């Protein structure tokens, strides 16, 4: 079984006058044939935080963690059998009509990323594929739209069965590791800070712009 885990960093806002509006939006996919070693990274990091800071179990969220926690988790991820593929979007160059259809834009970007994963044949799909995306919308209709759109695109073009799930990082621990990877890559583009990115760059097999 091949697993693809998907998360994003940045936002899809286009009012650049607002302070918190990001310049870039990225979608990160991590794929592996065995998710268990990555789950163990999360478990080990939680255990260390409990011992040192008496912190209760919860969710690791990279933006909220201390630098040492980020570094350790990313270094551990770099040692595992997994690969990362990224599409980054310079939002200033997004077509006007797509700016007004954010869900369509999100689906579009995700589909292009999945197409590249399949075309590069980085993962074996003969035993099936599970795509697990981090829950982005609480709206059930939008979640179903996302799942049906991607399933239709992949199955029609590649004749491959793909099972798509939308879960929280609490439900699917590996998504917490993808959050760290996505945050590290986002820092490189948004803030020209590649210090965290360099910890996992050996795992990144492709990193492409959309609307360059």
Predicted regions mapped to residue ranges:
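Phosphate-ester processing/binding pockets and catalytic centers
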Residues: 1-212
């Amino acid at each position: 079984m091949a697993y693809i885990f998907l998360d994003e960093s940045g936002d899809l806002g286009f009012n650049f006058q607002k302070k918190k509006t990001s310049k870039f939006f990225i979608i990160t996919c991590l794929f592996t044939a065995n998710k268990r070693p990555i789950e163990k990274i999360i478990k080990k990091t939680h255990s260390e935080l409990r011992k040192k800071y008496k912190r209760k179990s919860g969710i690791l969220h990279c933006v909220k963690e201390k630098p040492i926690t980020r570094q350790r988790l990313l270094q551990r991820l770099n040692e595992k059998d997994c690969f990362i593929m990224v599409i980054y979007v310079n939002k200033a160059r997004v077509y006007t009509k797509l700016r007004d259809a954010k869900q369509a834009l999100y689906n579009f970007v995700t589909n292009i990323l999945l197409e590249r994963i399949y075309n590069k044949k980085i993962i074996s799909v003969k035993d099936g594929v599970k795509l697990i995306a981090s829950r982005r919308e609480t709206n059930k209709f939008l979640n179903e739209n996302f799942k049906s759109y991607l399933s239709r695109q992949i199955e029609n073009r590649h004749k491959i069965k793909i099972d798509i799930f939308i879960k929280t990082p609490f439900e699917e621990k590996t998504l917490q590791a993808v959050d760290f990877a996505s945050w590290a890559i986002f820092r490189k583009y948004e803030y020209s800070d590649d210090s965290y990115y360099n910890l996992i760059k050996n795992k990144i097999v492709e990193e492409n712009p959309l609307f360059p």
